[in-house]
């Protein structure tokens, strides 16, 4: 390592970024080299340059704040005597072994016949008999009867509406013997109609399920007499036992750091205000592989611990080996620290929860020893774009009906949505670790949508899964615009299709098999609807272009006329409209009955509902096309990536909207032209579909504008209770987000290399703490040489991650950059500071403030 003399201006610049008093700075300014500077900071004049720069990490980190870190007992040393921050508790490993999946029924039978079985797993318990289990089974049989009966009646009406009614006249012997073209002409219309009828039945049954779910949810919320609600099993004020320790875990990956730690701080402070902080620990579990964001996370963790005095309560861990995505992140936590906690609450990066809500969840778990998971119903809030505010309004107004309805049908065999829920640790560790799906292709490998699977495994192991749909204090955020929502939907679509491979896995409860099926239908309904419309258009073309076949069998005495029953068409259309829109109307009726002030009043909430209904009708065909593409992409094995540009105001640029929605617009125009050519009168029926596709570009762009969203808020449109009377947790989150953005750390990796204090923090939080070994030293030397040669702009991601994880290499790179005054690194660092007027420059202590001496020689 170079030990050249330090330029006075470089040394002064270096010292200016350490929070020193004037006396300390003047004392250290007499150093003739950076090697001497690090020796004096470390208090060891005889140390080599390599040893000194590593030893100076502690003084550089603690100068001005040593007492704070020492009082919290945050400073420690690793096995090689290097300083480190205690950013996580001591590891106490627990065995976490996923059970291999046997998804093929035939292979499973063969293995059983040949005497081969899986490795023994922890014994599963039987869920104790309870009245709710019998009631739930009866309710689900009733639901199935209602859905099938309603679908059969609608199918009968649909069959009567279709024009061709001659299947009974088709003679199969005649079909086989006649020319192929005659067979096609004769059978084609009836084959089309049969396909349309089958698709209609599937889609109508899906709509029927949603209708009955919303209707029962409406009755539950209106009467308030749900004796099976899980939240009624606790008094709500009993003290939490000391052994009921709970870990709040927040898995993150390349997230918006200011918002993440603002929500974490608001949640932490709310728990502290509840008086139960000693029962909770907080873990930020990072899978971030962007080094700039990773360094920003480190600084944000230190800041939030200082601001809340959360040292020893708020922990941070960034994985170096990112396996199995989010489920692997949780597995890693369970393996390292899960045995120390009785419960775990999983938070999303945008989650906020009140201390009372979290305390209530723990009390409910204590009161229900057979519950494995209790899921809250998060309220969407905090967004300002027009699109997000309409979605917030929809989920806040209609969502409670569907959530309460799900609880009515499922009771203790319900959903888990992956966040804002409490989990019993022991059965989760023993039974809910997820093995990769076997095989090759798009539907093999790590499970993407882990939440439904974990709920199914928890129930299979004999534990209940409940929705506490009426528990307040649980919040989340929604995507700000349509394209961001669709980007998320693509991942969810692939995950739900993968999960269906588990439909026949041994031991799954029928309810959770149905959950896998509904998860698939959430996205498969889109291509089914699309093909239904395509086949309907094909039937129109057939009816228009092909000569009707009035006589389709030999010696037929009377012609078979195409039929039209307008009364059946009107009845079926009216019924479908009722099923689709009555839940929205029931939601408004419920709000009128309970009080509409928090939603802007009766008139405004009704007007908002009508506007949201129109907007959802505009977007439904757009989502249909995208979801159809997502399903096809999953089956064809196309990569599920979607790179959108960074947007400061969350708005969609016109260029991106044209690129994403352009093909849909062309499809809508071509489809409308075809139908107009075939039968102009039919265009009125198809206008809502093709019109939405044609308008998709401006609708996507305009709805993403924050200005329109705020204007609607000023007019009390799409108002939600969290905006009318904002909870303290959301107010705090908004305040801390603004503060964090003002002081956000940019170009984090460059600062971790160059900045004296940031480098010390990164070295103290680095986790690759290897001993001395020749291969490791050779690898370090190679990485250092590469970093010096190519500079920050040319350094690849793998090398960046390796350097950030290695405290020795990072300290050496820091020393070498300053010793050689490497312009490639220092100039980028200076530019980063100059371009960021709110950069968190370290404060310089006043000259009259006493500081401990840093000079050791």
Curated annotation (Swiss-Prot):
Keywords, in A-Z order: Cell inner membrane, Cell membrane, Glycosyltransferase, Membrane, Transferase, Transmembrane, Transmembrane helix
Highest taxon of source: Bacteria
EC number: 2.4.1.-
Cysteine disulfide partners in this protein: none
A cellular component annotation (GO) from this entry: plasma membrane
GO terms of biological process kind: glucan biosynthetic process
Cell compartments where the protein resides: Cell inner membrane
Principal location class: membrane
Presence of keyword Lipid biosynthesis: no
Membrane-spanning intervals of the chain: 142-162, 196-216, 515-535, 572-592, 606-626, 682-702
Similarity comment: family membership: Belongs to the glycosyltransferase 2 family. OpgH subfamily.
Purpose: Involved in the biosynthesis of osmoregulated periplasmic glucans (OPGs).
Protein name per its UniProtKB record: Glucans biosynthesis glucosyltransferase H
Species whose genome carries this gene: Pseudomonas putida (strain W619)
Encoding gene (name): opgH
